[in-house]
């Protein structure tokens, strides 16, 4: 059973209105965290900010790539000009580096690239 890196887009929706599937994944210890996602969420306005950030920080983390590794990954996979940003490439690289990991996102461009890399996870 794969473990899932839950992208910022999914977390934002969940924090606005509870996502049953995400709750199930959390309860089954299948959710992974990346420091970039944690940081993106920390930049926003969060109700119960300290509590949420503490809980998220203590989720299992993926193996994270260095900036140099991400640049090499971007070049090797030809991810330039595909409509995703550097943080997204970090998430993709970390997902590839972590055996059995998949990424769940609601961002259409990130999802398309994840699908092309065969690391996308879909809720349906």
Protein language model regions, located:
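Conserved nucleotide-sugar phosphate-binding/catalytic loop shared by glycosyltransferases and other
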Residues: 58
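Short, well-structured N-terminal submotif of metal-dependent ribonuclease cores
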Residues: 1-33, 42-54
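Active-site neighborhoods of divalent-metal-dependent phosphate/nucleic-acid chemistry enzymes
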Residues: 20, 61-124
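A generic "structured core" feature
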Residues: 2-3, 25, 32-33, 37, ...
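A generic structural signal for short hydrophobic patches within well-formed alpha-helices
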Residues: 11, 38-41, 110-111
């Amino acid at each position: 059973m794969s473990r899932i890196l839950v992208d910022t887009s999914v977390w934002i929706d969940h924090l606005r209105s509870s996502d049953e599937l995400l709750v199930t994944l959390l309860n089954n210890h299948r959710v992974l965290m990346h420091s970039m996602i944690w940081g993106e969420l920390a930049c926003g306005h969060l109700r119960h900010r300290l509590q949420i950030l503490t809980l998220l920080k203590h989720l299992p983390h993926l193996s994270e790539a260095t900036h140099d590794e991400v640049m090499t990954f971007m070049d090797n996979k030809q991810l330039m000009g595909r409509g995703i940003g550097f943080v997204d490439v970090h998430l993709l690289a970390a997902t590839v580096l972590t055996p059995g990991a998949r990424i769940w996102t609601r961002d259409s461009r990130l999802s398309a690239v994840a699908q092309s890399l065969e690391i996308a996870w879909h809720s349906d």
